[in-house]
C-alpha cells in the first residue's frame, strides 16, 4: 500500500514537471517580459511557465525576487575581484551637484548601457538627496559624503540592493568608490563636464570630471554654460590643485615706461608673466588662449570662479 501511494505521488509530480516543460510560451510574451525586466530569456521563460502569459505582474515580481537572491550571492562571490575600470559622473542643478565614481572589472562592462544606467541612477539619487541638505554660510563649495545605503532610487529601493542586482545581471564585481554631493554659495551656479565625453549633456561621464562654481555679474559675449564648459575643460586638461589668488599678469606700456631704454612713443607692449608650472587655477595660462590667465579670461566675461572640483577615475578620495 505504501509503495503504491509513493508511486502515485511520483507519477503525479513527474506529470506536472512534464506539463510545465511542454507548456508553450509565445515569442511575443517572452520578448515583452525580457524587454521589461532585462533578465535572461531562460529566466523569463521560467516565469511565464510558472504564472502564465496573462499574469505579467507576478512574473515580474518573481523574476525580481529571484534576481535579488542571485545578485546578493554573486556579489559576495565576486567581491574580491579587482575593479580597475569604470566611469566617474557629475550631475548638477543650479546650486547642487553630485559626483559618483563607479568601478568594474572590464572596459567592456564600463561601456555598456546597463552600467551607465546604474551610474546615472546612483548619481540622480545623490543629487536628489543633496537638494534637501541644509548648509551653513560660506564662500566655498560645501561637500557631503554619502554611503550607498543612504540612497534610494525613484521606486524607493535601496541602492545597495540595486547594485547587487546589477552585479548579478552583468556578472562582474562592481564597487562605488565615491558618492559626493556639493552645495554652492548663494549667487553661484554649478556646472560639470567630463572627458572622454560619455553619458549625456545633462549627466556627463568619463575617466575625468570637473565641477565649477561660477558667478557672473552681467551677461558676457558667451553664455554662462559655454564659459563654464571651457573652464571645466581647462581644469580637466591642466590639473590645477588650488584656486589661487586673482592676479592680472598682463603689464601694459605704462608699466614699462620707466624702464631704461623704453620709448614711450612706441606702440603699446603687452608682456605676460605666466609660469607654465603654475598649479593655482586662476594664475594658470588659459588653455584656449595661453596669452591670458584664467582669471583674465573670466574677468573679460564678467565672471569669476568661486571653487572647483576635479576627479580622476581611480584617483585619491
Curated annotation (Swiss-Prot):
The keyword Mitochondrion applies. Residues 248-268 are annotated as: Disordered. Residues 250-259 have a biased composition (Polar residues). It is found in: Mitochondrion. GO terms for cellular component: mitochondrion. It holds the Pfam family EF-Ts_N. Keywords: Elongation factor, Mitochondrion, Protein biosynthesis. GO terms for molecular function: translation elongation factor activity. One of its GO terms (biological process) is mitochondrial translational elongation. InterPro entries: EF-Ts_dimer_sf, Transl_elong_EFTs/EF1B, Transl_elong_EFTs/EF1B_dimer, Transl_elong_Ts_CS, UBA-like_sf. The keyword Mitochondrion applies. This protein may be expected to contain an N-terminal transit peptide but none has been predicted. Associates with the EF-Tu.GDP complex and induces the exchange of GDP to GTP. It remains bound to the aminoacyl-tRNA.EF-Tu.GTP complex up to the GTP hydrolysis stage on the ribosome. Belongs to the EF-Ts family. HAMAP family: EF_Ts. This is Elongation factor Ts, mitochondrial. It comes from Caenorhabditis briggsae.
Amino acid at each position: 500500500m505504501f509503495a503504491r501511494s509513493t508511486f502515485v505521488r511520483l507519477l503525479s509530480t513527474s506529470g506536472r514537471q512534464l506539463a510545465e516543460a511542454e507548456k508553450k510560451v509565445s515569442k511575443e510574451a517572452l520578448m515583452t517580459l525580457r524587454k521589461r525586466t532585462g533578465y535572461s530569456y531562460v529566466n523569463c521563460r521560467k516565469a511565464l511557465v510558472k504564472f502564465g502569459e496573462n499574469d505579467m505582474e507576478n512574473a515580474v515580481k518573481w523574476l525580481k525576487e529571484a534576481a535579488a537572491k542571485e545578485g546578493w550571492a554573486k556579489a559576495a562571490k565576486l567581491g574580491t575581484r579587482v575593479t580597475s575600470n569604470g566611469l566617474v559622473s557629475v550631475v548638477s542643478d543650479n546650486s547642487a551637484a553630485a559626483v559618483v565614481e563607479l568601478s568594474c572589472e572590464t572596459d567592456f562592462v564600463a561601456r555598456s548601457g546597463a552600467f551607465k544606467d546604474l551610474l546615472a541612477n546612483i548619481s540622480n539619487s545623490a543629487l536628489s538627496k543633496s537638494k534637501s541638505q541644509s548648509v551653513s554660510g560660506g564662500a566655498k563649495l560645501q561637500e557631503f559624503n554619502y554611503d550607498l545605503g543612504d540612497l534610494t532610487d525613484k521606486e524607493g529601493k535601496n541602492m545597495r540592493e540595486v547594485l547587487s542586482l546589477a552585479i548579478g545581471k552583468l556578472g562582474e564585481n562592481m564597487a562605488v568608490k565615491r558618492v559626493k554631493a556639493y552645495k554652492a554659495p548663494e549667487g553661484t551656479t554649478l556646472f560639470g563636464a567630463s572627458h572622454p565625453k560619455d553619458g549625456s549633456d545633462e549627466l556627463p561621464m568619463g575617466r575625468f570630471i570637473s565641477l565649477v562654481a561660477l558667478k557672473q555679474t552681467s551677461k558676457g559675449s558667451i553664455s554662462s554654460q559655454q564659459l563654464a564648459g571651457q573652464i571645466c575643460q581647462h581644469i580637466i586638461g591642466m590639473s590645477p590643485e588650488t584656486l589661487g589668488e586673482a592676479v592680472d599678469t598682463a603689464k601694459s606700456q605704462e608699466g614699462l615706461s620707466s624702464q631704461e631704454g623704453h620709448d614711450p612713443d612706441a606702440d603699446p607692449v603687452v608682456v605676460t608673466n605666466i609660469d607654465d608650472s603654475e598649479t593655482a587655477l586662476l594664475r594658470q595660462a588659459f588653455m584656449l588662449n595661453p596669452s591670458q590667465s584664467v582669471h583674465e579670461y573670466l574677468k573679460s566675461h564678467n565672471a569669476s570662479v568661486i571653487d572647483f572640483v576635479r576627479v580622476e577615475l581611480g584617483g585619491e578620495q
